[in-house]
Amino acid sequence: MSNFKLLATKLWVKILCPTWSFIVNCFYWLFRLNRLKKYLPIKNDYSYLTLNELMSKFKWKADNLKDWNPWVITIIARDLVDDCDGAAVLAKWWYKEHASEGRIVILYSADGKLGHAVCVREDNKEFVSNNEVVVLNPNNWEDDLMQKFGNKYSVII
């Protein structure tokens, strides 16, 4: 990935995507605000599931819009259907609910045309990719992560 493309990608990931995501989430709830109370108890129920149970309910679907990160309540309102960004957001929320932390890591191919979001637990011992929870070697987690995807990605943001 060229320096310019890498800089543009980092700008998108760190600044533009969160702004765009806020707009998309607000627009989504603008016409559904009256249903918000319905999803709060479901969110609470999901917090009692194991991570494997929760992620097994997740269904991957390609984005219709430019890439965006849904809020957890938005993912729940959409019946746990989203793309890899939604899965990473959901896993990060689950870790926080269970006194741990996770971070969203974005993987890109060398040419920048192929990208994927995952959530890596704070101790680097596991990551979540769509509906899978995968064990990592914490001492060499970056290389292990790349190998889990057959080395089709080479850039971590």
Residue positions per predicted region:
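A structural boundary/capping signal
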Residues: 1-157
